[in-house]
């Protein structure tokens, strides 16, 4: 099962961010000099619907302790229905993580618009604290899970 928090644990969090909304909110948060956790590595994708099972599972198998997916609010997708596809895929991914005995709380989906820099900082910081409490990813370096 899950590892408990270890002293000195520094989580590795991957953030897949929609180019049109969440990535722009990250830029706004940075230019507003908001305090944001340094444990997040942001990867810009054109739409949150581009994040598939392979991207998420590969990140976990390669040592990510948590994954944060950021997309446009439902109904505001630049590509019309992309975030609806994301929401369905996210629900399936949570089930897959549970099957792998990896706490589904290590994966989070948040809708953050381009003007929500404060919300972006809040979501990132709260998710980082959640991952710190969960401890290191138990799948990291284990080829047999």
Predicted regions and their residues:
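Iron-sulfur-associated redox domains of electron-transfer enzymes in respiratory
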Residues: 1-145
């Amino acid at each position: 099962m899950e590892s408990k928090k270890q002293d000195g644990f520094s989580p590795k969090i991957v953030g897949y961010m929609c180019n049109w909304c969440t990535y722009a909110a990250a830029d706004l948060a940075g230019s507003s000099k908001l305090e944001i956790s340094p444990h997040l590595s942001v990867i810009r994708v054109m739409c949150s619907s581009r994040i598939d099972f392979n991207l998420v599972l590969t990140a976990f198998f390669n040592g990510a302790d948590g994954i944060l997916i950021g997309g446009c609010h439902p109904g505001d997708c630049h590509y019309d229905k992309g975030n609806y596809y994301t929401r369905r895929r996210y629900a399936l991914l949570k089930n897959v993580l549970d099957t792998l005995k990896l706490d589904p709380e290590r994966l989070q989906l948040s809708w953050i618009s381009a003007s929500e820099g404060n919300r972006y900082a809040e979501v990132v910081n709260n998710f980082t604290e959640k991952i710190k409490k969960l401890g290191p990813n138990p799948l990291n370096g284990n080829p047999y899970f």
